[in-house]
Amino acid sequence: MTDPESPPPAPVQRPSRAASIGALVLIVEALGIAVLALWQVLAIFRGDTVSLASALALIVLTFLFAVAVASFAVATMRSRSWGRSGGVVTQVLVLAIALGALTGQYAHPFLALVLAVPAVIGIWALWAAARAAGRNAPR
């Protein structure tokens, strides 16, 4: 039963298009990270690991990162600033990985492009979502 003295619930706002795009990029990245963790689990069963303890720790951290990125996506859809800021940090980390894939002895330009393009789209979308949230904020 509701309290007659309590204020009415805030109206539900639909996320901006930019927030939806940013959240979609984050969800796809979270799924990719989860697949990477499953690949690491398979590497243990194939015997491709030197240290079981290190491999297990890396798997746990990878799954935790997948959950964190997925939570950034959910928070972005709910117009929470911490989700957008966490998403931007994630995109910057992905860009750093793309730069590493582009340079060095074992450079792989196509992989760098596959990583960099969604990260740039994600940064743009999350930045635009933050701008839209600022415009729609009560003053």
Predicted regions and their residues:
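Topology signature of small-to-medium multi-pass alpha-helical membrane proteins
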Residues: M1-R139
